[in-house]
Amino acid sequence: MSTQNWCEAPEIHPSQIRVGDVIGTRRPTDLRLTVKMISGPQSGPRQWTFFSRDEHGQQRTSTFAEDDVVRRYAKA
């Protein structure tokens, strides 16, 4: 079952996101992003970059740091 409301979507650590998950933006919107590829931390400050697509097919990139949380609507 997927969450429909941005406020109700669980906040999880970026390391728990997987390809195929549906995530939200940092601010409250109705935009849903399907993760297509993930760039994980290599060295230095730990960051995760998610390469995703919205429902209109537009590609988007979001970067989250170690202390950030990601809102996940649906798990892959």
Residue ranges and their predicted role:
Residues 2-7, 51-76:
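Intrinsically disordered, low-complexity, charged/polar segments
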Residues 1-19:
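Mixed-charge, Lys/Arg-rich low-complexity intrinsically disordered regions
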Residues 29-64:
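Basic/aromatic-rich interaction segments and small domains that mediate binding to polyanionic partners
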